[in-house]
């Protein structure tokens, strides 16, 4: 019985943590843009407008999504070429089909 209670408690705590991370008030859901390009003329959605920030958000600081996307786009390096070379073997099915067509 104690084991069942412990598992139930862990489940409830895990669900509460996930619900807190994905929860938005209903009023903010109505203001959210429907499509990615729907708010082109408007100011970007800021984290500080969402209300009081949770502890993890305060630790991360306030960054606009365009800044985060720009930072990610800068992180292209020599590993991209290495990945292309490493994944070159994945087209073996196409090569096998071409080799089969060459033999009468």
UniProtKB/Swiss-Prot annotation:
Residues 22-58, 96-104 form a propeptide. Sulfation enhances proteolytic processing, and blocks peptide degradation. Levels of sulfation differ between proteolytically-cleaved gastrins and between tissues. Keywords: Amidation, Cleavage on pair of basic residues, Hormone, Phosphoprotein, Secreted, Signal, Sulfation. This is Gastrin. Belongs to the gastrin/cholecystokinin family. Residues 26-70 are annotated as: Disordered. The modification Phenylalanine amide is found at residue 92. One of its GO terms (molecular function) is hormone activity. It comes from Ovis aries. InterPro entries: GAST, Gastrin/CCK, Gastrin/cholecystokinin_CS. One of its GO terms (biological process) is G protein-coupled receptor signaling pathway. It is found in: Secreted. The modification Phosphoserine is found at residue 96. Transmembrane segments: none annotated. The modification Sulfotyrosine is found at residue 87. One of its GO terms (cellular component) is extracellular space. Pfam families: Gastrin. Residues 1-21 form the signal peptide. The keyword Mitochondrion does not apply. Gastrin stimulates the stomach mucosa to produce and secrete hydrochloric acid and the pancreas to secrete its digestive enzymes. It also stimulates smooth muscle contraction and increases blood circulation and water secretion in the stomach and intestine. It comes from the Eukaryota.
């Amino acid at each position: 019985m104690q084991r069942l209670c412990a598992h139930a408690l862990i489940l409830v705590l895990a669900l509460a943590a996930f619900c807190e991370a994905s929860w938005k008030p209903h009023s903010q859901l109505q203001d959210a843009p429907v499509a990615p390009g729907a708010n082109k003329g408007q100011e970007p959605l800021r984290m500080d407008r969402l209300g009081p920030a949770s502890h993890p958000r305060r630790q991360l600081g306030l960054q606009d999504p365009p800044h985060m996307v720009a930072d990610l786009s800068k992180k292209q390096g020599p590993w991209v070429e290495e990945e292309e070379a490493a994944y070159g073997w994945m087209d073996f099915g196409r090569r096998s089909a071409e080799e089969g067509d060459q033999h009468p």
